[in-house]
Swiss-Prot record:
Organism: Marinobacter nauticus (strain ATCC 700491 / DSM 11845 / VT8) (Marinobacter aquaeolei)
GO molecular function, one term: transcription cis-regulatory region binding
Family from the record: Belongs to the nucleoid occlusion factor SlmA family.
Highest taxon listed in the record's lineage: Bacteria
Localization, UniProt: Cytoplasm, Nucleoid
Self-association state and partner proteins as the record states: Homodimer. Interacts with FtsZ.
Name listed for the protein in its UniProt record: Nucleoid occlusion factor SlmA
UniProt keyword annotation of Ribosomal protein present: no
Keywords: Cell cycle, Cell division, Coiled coil, Cytoplasm, DNA-binding
Amino acid sequence: MTNQKPSRRESILQALVELLQSDPGARITTAGLAKTVGVTEAALYRHFPSKRKMFEALIEFAEEAVFSRCQVILQEQEDVRVRLQQLSHLVLVFAERNPGLCCVLTGDALMGEDESLRKRASQFFERLETQIRQALKEGEIRQGLRPRTTAARGADFVMVFVEGRIQRFVRSSFLRLPTSDFDEAWGLVSEAVWG
């Protein structure tokens, strides 16, 4: 079995994520990124026409990685409580394994960038919330598991938990892991959603 060398495009994205992880909150310049990758800025632009396209590629990677697995969970699990627990855990594990990407998804790395890019990043969480809301509605119909309040408010509560854990991870410079004490914390979330 041979290990394939990553493409230049993948190397650029990997270097960008590593820069975001090693210096959270710092503004990334194409000159600094080119230096890290070991290429010229012109070489960066051969693969990405703009820094925006680099960030969009990272967001697309996160969406593909998370939502393809979300679909598997939604298809395999019947119980809405298990579905939501696994969906939440999946996102938090992904965040923990990809700290630099968390800076993009939370918008921290996008400060000073085009506002439409921040909106693009927020679509990740909006899409997740939609899936959670839909799962809550299906749980009510198929299992008779009615949330204490509406499906929209239940989904909002789950999202506050997930996004809060990811935001805390970024704010702590990746020291406070989003999955720490997950089972205990999820028990409290579950209690709040269903009673």
